[in-house]
């Protein structure tokens, strides 16, 4: 007999998930509130914009993305935030998630479909099939000059203020601007 078989492990996993799912609305509300307070502390820093949200009501608030005029400013801001003790900050291009050239199955054109869709479809025969870094220069530029700051699910007001002030000061510091 395999470990866990006959031990109702599926029921245990379901019971734990059921309890965790009930907590989800509070966790999301807290992250949204933390993100809103941090954005309020930041105000409207010159030369920096917030990522446009196409569905603000659907944003759960797990991170804050700031967009700079150039890659150097983003890099310097991450360095300054790290120097100030903020560890959960990255240039978006280095974060790794959900960026086309980091999705191996997309770059390699590996399909879940046995038919190889969409790459093997006759309708796509004329399409350019390159998803390596550099295939989308406008997106690449955006990724390179954006930073992502993760928002933990249970920040206290003191932590929100400290993070907000560190970001505000780092964005406004001469080292981040030049």
Q: Which residues are covered by each model-predicted region?
A:
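PLP-dependent aminotransferase class I/II
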Residues: 1-178
């Amino acid at each position: 007999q395999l470990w866990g078989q006959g031990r109702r492990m599926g029921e245990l996993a379901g019971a734990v998930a059921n309890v965790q799912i009930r907590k989800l609305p509070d966790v999301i509300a807290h992250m949204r509130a933390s993100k809103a307070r941090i954005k309020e502390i930041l105000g409207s820093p010159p030369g920096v914009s917030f990522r446009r949200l196409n569905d603000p009501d659907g944003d759960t608030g797990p991170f804050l993305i700031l967009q700079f005029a150039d890659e150097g400013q983003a890099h310097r801001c991450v360095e300054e935030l790290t120097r100030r003790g903020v560890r959960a900050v990255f240039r978006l291009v280095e974060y790794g998630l959900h960026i086309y050239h980091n999705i191996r199955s997309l770059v390699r054109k590996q399909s879940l479909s046995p038919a190889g869709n969409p790459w093997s479809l006759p309708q796509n025969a004329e399409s350019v099939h390159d998803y390596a870094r550099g295939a989308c220069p406008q997106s690449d530029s955006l990724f390179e000059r954006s930073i992502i700051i993760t928002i933990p699910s249970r920040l206290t007001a003191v932590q929100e203020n400290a993070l907000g002030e560190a970001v505000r000061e780092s964005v406004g510091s001469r080292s981040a601007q030049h």
